From Swiss-Prot:
One of its GO terms (molecular function) is DNA binding. Keywords: Repressor, Stress response, Transcription, Transcription regulation. PANTHER family: HEAT-INDUCIBLE TRANSCRIPTION REPRESSOR HRCA (PTHR34824:SF1). Transmembrane segments: none annotated. Belongs to the HrcA family. Negative regulator of class I heat shock genes (grpE-dnaK-dnaJ and groELS operons). Prevents heat-shock induction of these operons. The lineage of its organism: Bacteria, Bacillati, Bacillota, Bacilli, Lactobacillales. GO terms for biological process: negative regulation of DNA-templated transcription. InterPro entries: GAF-like_dom_sf, HrcA, HrcA_C, WH-like_DNA-bd_sf, WH_DNA-bd_sf, WHTH_HrcA_DNA-bd, WHTH_transcript_rep_HrcA_IDD. The gene is hrcA. The keyword S-adenosyl-L-methionine does not apply. Pfam families: HrcA (PF01628), HrcA_DNA-bdg (PF03444). This is Heat-inducible transcription repressor HrcA. Disulfide bonds: none annotated.
Length: 344
C-alpha cells in the first residue's frame, strides 16, 4: 500500500504522461505537490521500487508502468465520470437521420473511434436474451424462399434458403406452423434448446424424411445465435498494438465473447489494463460499458486502446456516447411503438 502523497504523485504522473507522453520529473510535480523536490524524488524512487513507475532511458524523469496504470485505474479512476466539454461534440455528431437500429450502433462506434483515435466495438443485446416475436416464410420462386423473423418486436432478421428438393408447398406451411406453435415467443436460448430436444420429435409427426427438415431448422435459426457486432477504427490498432490485435478484430464473434467476459456478473462498467484473457488483447487496455437499449435490454460499448491512454477522457467519452446513444434509441423505439402519422 502506498501513502496518500505517493498516490497523488502517481496520479499526477499518469495525468501528465497521458497528455504529453513525455517522462515526468520532480520539478513538474512540485507545481502541484506541496513537498520539496528531494521528498518527491524519494517517493518516486519508492514507487519505482514497487513497480508502479519506470525510469526513462533518455531523461531523469519517470513514466507509469503497466502496473502503475492498473493501480491508477483501480484506485483513482471514476468509471462514471463525464467531461462536459465533450457533451456538445457528441450530441452534434449524433445529429443524423437513422432508419434502423444498426445505423445508430454503427454511428456510435465510429464516433468513439474518431474522437479517441483508438478502436471501438459495439454489441447489440446478447443473442440469448432476445425473443422471437414474429416469423413468416415468403416463397421467392419454385426453388428458394425467405424466412423473415422479428426479435423483440423490432429487430428483423432474414435468411434466404434453397427449398429442399423433396419439399412441397404444404411442407413449407408445416415448417412455418411448427415454428409458430413451438418456437414463437421463446427466447433465443430456449429456441437453441428446443432445436436439440423437442423439434426432432415434432418433425417426425409431419415429415416422412426428417434429415433435411432438421438441417433447414438449423440453417434458418443459426443466424439468431450470432452476435451483432460493429467495429470501428480497426486500422488504429496498428498504432498501439501489433498485427495480432488487428487480425483478431476480424473475428467479430470471438471479439464479442472476449468483451462480454471482461464484465463480471452485475457489473455495468470495467477497465482492463493489459489484463484480458484473450492473447490478442493482453497488451492493450479495454474499457467496457453497458448502455440501455430501451424495451430490449443492454448493449455493450467498448474501447480498445494503448495502456498509456488518457483514461479520464476515454471513460468520459464512453459514458457520454453511451448516454446519448441510449437517449437516441429511446426516441427511436418510442417512434416505432407510436401511431405513425404524417405532419403536413
Amino acid at each position: 500500500m502506498i501513502t496518500q502523497r505517493q498516490n497523488d504523485i502517481l496520479n499526477l504522473i499518469v495525468e501528465l504522461f497521458t497528455q504529453t507522453h513525455e517522462p515526468v520529473g520532480s520539478k513538474a510535480l512540485q507545481r502541484t505537490i506541496d513537498s520539496s523536490s528531494a521528498t518527491i524524488r524519494n517517493d518516486m524512487a519508492k514507487l519505482e521500487k514497487l513497480g508502479l513507475l519506470e525510469k526513462a532511458h533518455t531523461s531523469s524523469g519517470r513514466m507509469p508502468s503497466p502496473a502503475g496504470f492498473k493501480y491508477f485505474v483501480e484506485h483513482s479512476l471514476r468509471l462514471d465520470s463525464i467531461d462536459e466539454q465533450d457533451i456538445y461534440h457528441v450530441i452534434k455528431a449524433f445529429d443524423f437521420e437513422a432508419f434502423k437500429l444498426e445505423d445508430m450502433l454503427q454511428k456510435a462506434s465510429h464516433i468513439l473511434a474518431e474522437m479517441t483515435g483508438y478502436t471501438s466495438v459495439i454489441l447489440d443485446v446478447e443473442p440469448a436474451r432476445q425473443r422471437l416475436t414474429g416469423f413468416d416464410v415468403v416463397q421467392l420462386s419454385n426453388h428458394d424462399a425467405l424466412a423473415v423473423m422479428t426479435l423483440d418486436e423490432s429487430k428483423p432478421v432474414t435468411v434466404q434458403f434453397a427449398i429442399p428438393r423433396n419439399f412441397l408447398t404444404r411442407d413449407l406451411i408445416a415448417f412455418k406452423a411448427i415454428v409458430e406453435e413451438r418456437l414463437l415467443d421463446n427466447s433465443v436460448i430456449d429456441i437453441h434448446y428446443k432445436l436439440r430436444t423437442e423439434i426432432p420429435q415434432i418433425v417426425q409427426k409431419y415429415f416422412v424424411t426428417t434429415d433435411n427438415v432438421l438441417q433447414l431448422f438449423d440453417y434458418v435459426f443459426s443466424e439468431l445465435f450470432l452476435e451483432t457486432v460493429f467495429v470501428a477504427g480497426k486500422v488504429n490498432s496498428l498504432t498501439y498494438s501489433d498485427l495480432s490485435t488487428y487480425q483478431f478484430l476480424d473475428n467479430e464473434q470471438q471479439v464479442a465473447i472476449s468483451l462480454r467476459q471482461s464484465l463480471k456478473e452485475g457489473e455495468m462498467a470495467s477497465v482492463q489494463v493489459a489484463d484480458s484473457q484473450e492473447a490478442a488483447l493482453a497488451d492493450v487496455s479495454v474499457l467496457t460499458h453497458k448502455f440501455l437499449i430501451p424495451y430490449r435490454g443492454f448493449g455493450l460499448l467498448s474501447l480498445i486502446g494503448p495502456i498509456d491512454m488518457d483514461y479520464r477522457r476515454s471513460v468520459s467519452l464512453v459514458n457520454i456516447i453511451g448516454k446519448v446513444l441510449a437517449a437516441k434509441l429511446g426516441d427511436y423505439y418510442r417512434y416505432l411503438n407510436s401511431n405513425h402519422y404524417e405532419v403536413h
